[in-house]
Amino acid sequence: MFSRAARSLVMRTGLRTRGTGTHSPGDAAGSQRRMTPYVDCYAQRSYPMPDEPFCTELSEEQRALKEKEKGSWTQLSQAEKVALYRLQFHETFAEMNHRSNEWKTVMGCVFFFIGFTALVIWWQRVYVFPKKVVTLTEERKAQQLQRLLDMKSNPIQGLAAHWDYEKKEWKK
């Protein structure tokens, strides 16, 4: 725990053993900016402590509350403590860990595209693909089978081996 906090402090303050780190912005243009893991003042579970408070421009009530904060915390009510917390942080851990309903949108889009694809396939089968060939009808398939049997094709292991030519039926 301590090593993680120390590493976080070193990374935030910019104390590095080398001039540029692996993931640092670099000194190519002479910039001394450092990349903070905390972006846009929104807390993340991996980095919940912001470098700067959530609210930087305070109203008169909030300034008075900040002055009252410098005194004893036993004098503060629960609502004032919550208001001070909200000045510093955007969300609580419970709010950060709360599940979003984004999965509903994703699943809706997935089902929409599956339905659209099914409509395109149906349209292609009806209007684009040619009609069934005549040779695929049941009558033609029966004629082809009879022709193969008449030619006695593959008499050892094929169709002719399972056909009884005397009784004109399949062997049992």
From Swiss-Prot:
InterPro entries found in the cross-reference section: Cyt_c_oxidase_su4, Cyt_c_oxidase_su4_fam, Cyt_c_oxidase_su4_sf
The pathway this protein participates in, as annotated, is: Energy metabolism; oxidative phosphorylation
Could you tell me which residues belong to the region Disordered? 13-32
* Cellular component aspect of the GO annotation: mitochondrial inner membrane; mitochondrial membrane; mitochondrion; respiratory chain complex IV
Where does it reside? Mitochondrion inner membrane
Is Transmembrane helix included in the keywords of this UniProt record?
Answer: yes
What ranges are annotated Mitochondrial intermembrane (topological domains)?
128-172
What topology in the membrane does the UniProt record assign? Single-pass membrane protein
Leader sequence residues: none
Identify the main location.
Answer: mitochondrion
Bias kind Low complexity: ranges: 13-22
Keyword field: Membrane, Mitochondrion, Mitochondrion inner membrane, Transit peptide, Transmembrane, Transmembrane helix
Which Pfam families does this entry report, sorted A to Z? Answer: COX4
Mitochondrial matrix-side positions: 35-101
The stretch annotated as transit peptide is 1-34
> Which Gene Ontology BP annotations are present?
mitochondrial electron transport, cytochrome c to oxygen
GO terms (molecular function) for this protein are: cytochrome-c oxidase activity
TM segment ranges: 102-127
Cite the record's note on assembly.
Answer: Component of the cytochrome c oxidase (complex IV, CIV), a multisubunit enzyme composed of 14 subunits. The complex is composed of a catalytic core of 3 subunits MT-CO1, MT-CO2 and MT-CO3, encoded in the mitochondrial DNA, and 11 supernumerary subunits COX4I, COX5A, COX5B, COX6A, COX6B, COX6C, COX7A, COX7B, COX7C, COX8 and NDUFA4, which are encoded in the nuclear genome.
Write out the similarity annotation.
Belongs to the cytochrome c oxidase IV family.
Tell me the function of this protein: Component of the cytochrome c oxidase, the last enzyme in the mitochondrial electron transport chain which drives oxidative phosphorylation. The respiratory chain contains 3 multisubunit complexes succinate dehydrogenase (complex II, CII), ubiquinol-cytochrome c oxidoreductase (cytochrome b-c1 complex, complex III, CIII) and cytochrome c oxidase (complex IV, CIV), that cooperate to transfer electrons derived from NADH and succinate to molecular oxygen, creating an electrochemical gradient over the inner membrane that drives transmembrane transport and the ATP synthase.
Record-given protein name: Cytochrome c oxidase subunit 4 isoform 2, mitochondrial
The gene that this protein is the product of is: Cox4i2
